Each structure stands twice: as structure tokens, then as C-alpha cells.
């Protein structure tokens, strides 16, 4: 196996991403008076479906001993889908989040840590113990891998279309020097 320093750097960057996502989520305060916003409910439904679909794909990669493919799928799921989309959608403006979205997010984080653990055991073990209080001797290493729930491929597809539209709009705004903060009329 050839040593490539850029792979070490990529691993470091991924570790930082995982740690910072954890810090972001744990930095939120729950406001019991806030009902779950519609955009958060949609994001939860999408990510739950996507996570279940991904678990099936990752399980298939493991069964066929395609460890590199499994890792790449987990990497993209965490970095692109969980951090860049899900967390950005649900991120509360004032640091206060509704309980339902917060609890679902911790469940997702727990499942993601279990998926990442075979490849990055130390950081995932540390964060898993910090997510909630664990019993003496309890270890992420001894936990079952998450199982896929029933999910809607149609919902995933619809959400992907919405993401594509958003990316296109952002690209047009940037190419035309239109402020990303200003309102934009779409037809």
C-alpha cells in the first residue's frame, strides 16, 4: 500500500468535520415552546429516508468486501448530506431548536457514528460517549450497526430535485453577482 500524505490530510479534515458537527448540535438549546417547523419536519423525513437507503447500500458494500466504497458512501453521506444540507436546513437562527428536531438529530448522529466507527474508531467512540450518558464499560465497538427503516425513494427523489434547483439558483446568483441574501423572484 502506497502512503499518500493527502489521504492523511483528508482524514484529519473529516475528523474535524465530525467534531464540529457534534459541537454545533450540542451547542443548541431546546425551547419547549417551539413546535417543529415544517422545513425541519421535511428535512427529518428526507434524511431519515436517505439514511435508511444509505444503510442498505453500505451493508451491500460490506457484504461484497468493498470497504473503500462503503467508506466513500459514509463520507459523502456525513459531509454532503448531513452537514451541508440537513444541519443547514434545521439550524435554528437564535440557537434555540424544538425538542422533536433536536432528538431526531441526535438519533441520526448516533447512527452515523456507528457507521463511521469501523473506519474511525477513536473519534466516534469519544463522541458517542458524549452524546448521552453511557453505562460503565459500554462501548460503541460492541453496538449493532444501524438497520434500515422503511423509506420513500420517491421522497428522496423529490428532495434531490429541490436540492438541484437550489444549487442552480445559487450558481446563477453567483455568476450574475446577485447577493445571496436579497430576495429573488422566481417564475
PLM-predicted stretches and their roles:
Residues 1-13, 63-64, 68-69, 152-160:
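Conserved phosphate-binding loops in nucleotide/dinucleotide-binding enzymes
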Residues 31-59, 87-167, 182, 187:
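Acidic, turn-prone loop/beta-hairpin segments
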Residues 69-73, 180-185:
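Short amphipathic alpha-helical interface segments
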Residues 1-40, 132-136, 174-181:
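Catalytic adenosine-cofactor/nucleotide-binding cores of aminoacyl-tRNA synthetases and other
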Residues 52, 66, 74, 169-173:
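Long hydrophobic segments that form regular secondary structure
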Residues 1-26, 72, 103-125, 129:
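Structured ligand/cofactor/substrate-binding pocket environments in proteins
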Residues 62-63, 94, 173:
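Hydrophobic residues in alpha-helical segments
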Residues 13-26, 44-54, 71-92:
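Core structural elements
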Amino acid at each position: 500500500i502506497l502512503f499518500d500524505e493527502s489521504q492523511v490530510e483528508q482524514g484529519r479534515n473529516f475528523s474535524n468535520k465530525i467534531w464540529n458537527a457534534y459541537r454545533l448540535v450540542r451547542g443548541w438549546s431546546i425551547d419547549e415552546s417551539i413546535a417543529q417547523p415544517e422545513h425541519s419536519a421535511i428535512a427529518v423525513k428526507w434524511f431519515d429516508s436517505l439514511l435508511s437507503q444509505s444503510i442498505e447500500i453500505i451493508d451491500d458494500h460490506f457484504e461484497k468486501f468493498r470497504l473503500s466504497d462503503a467508506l466513500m458512501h459514509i463520507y459523502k453521506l456525513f459531509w454532503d448530506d448531513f452537514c451541508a444540507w440537513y444541519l443547514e436546513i434545521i439550524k435554528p437562527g437564535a440557537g434555540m431548536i424544538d425538542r422533536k428536531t433536536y432528538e431526531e438529530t441526535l438519533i441520526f448522529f448516533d447512527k452515523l457514528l456507528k457507521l463511521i466507527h469501523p473506519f474511525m474508531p477513536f473519534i466516534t467512540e469519544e463522541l458517542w460517549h458524549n452524546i448521552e450518558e453511557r453505562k460503565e464499560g459500554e462501548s460503541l465497538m460492541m453496538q449493532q450497526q444501524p438497520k434500515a427503516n422503511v423509506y420513500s425513494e420517491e421522497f428522496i427523489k423529490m428532495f434531490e430535485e429541490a436540492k438541484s434547483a437550489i444549487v442552480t439558483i445559487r450558481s446563477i446568483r453567483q455568476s450574475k453577482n446577485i447577493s445571496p441574501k436579497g430576495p429573488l423572484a422566481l417564475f
